[in-house]
Amino acid sequence: TSERLEIGGHPLVTGVDKPTRKEALDYYRKVVHNEKLNVKTFHEVTNIKRLAVGFETTAQTDKGQSVTLKSRFVALATGYFDNPKYLGIPGEDLPNVSHYFTEAHPYYERNVTIIGAGSSAADAALDLFKAGANVTMVHRGDSFRFSLKYWIKPNLENRVKEGSIKVHFNSVTKEITSDAVIIEKRLEDGTPETIIIPTDQTFALTGYYASTKLLEGVGVVIKSEDFSAQLNEDTFETNVGGFFVIGSAGYGTRTSDIFIENGLIHAEKAVKEVVRRLENTPVSA
């Protein structure tokens, strides 16, 4: 809801209970403007180096220039969408296959197959259906995930029930071609059946994971079981003093645990700790 997305005491006013992506982006841009925050867009951080005091962050601009910034603290909040979970099957690198969904309009009256059944896959399926695409979903499980957003799950299930969106449960994708997706479906008696789904475009929305490259580069301890960072969840500081990780960036493959709402709580705790140190005052009870 709007209230859960608000930051810095700035109200997010929308016409409906849940703001659209555009409304949220407009809101955050206005917060940056009103607070006069020093935001450097089109700067990709390539390295973070620990110094005797503080850190040195190196970034590459869209013009190919290298920029170096020094700071006493660093808070990493890069999310996890840079790293798709690849299927490792033939045809995954074809031009009609994508691990990211942007918009539905180009696929009007096209056959679209979505691999996956998480929130990203569910959102894409509904958007594509509304835009007039012929949508088929493929999921290895026997039902939609319980973790689906509560306002999306009933809508998706109703579209499947009425036949507007087709779904193959208990199915594993074996291969993607230029005009089809080949799956192996487990029938009720346990026997496998090969099914060929005519497809113009495939969206493999099977999840993402947070990169550990920058974390490991600065010396943050990474847990081997899920690639999450060692964090103090009272402050979201890592084992490296002065280095904080906010949101899903520190949770490796545990991305379903983190949302915008609780990521904002991480930020509040981290900023409170940074302010405390800058002011050199004890944390109030």
What are these regions (language model features)?
Residues 26, 34-71, 130-226, 282-285:
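A Rossmann-like FAD-binding core segment of flavoenzymes
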Residues 76-92, 208-220:
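Flavin (primarily FAD) binding-site architecture
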Residues 1-27, 164:
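Glycine-rich active-site loop/strand segments that organize a redox cofactor
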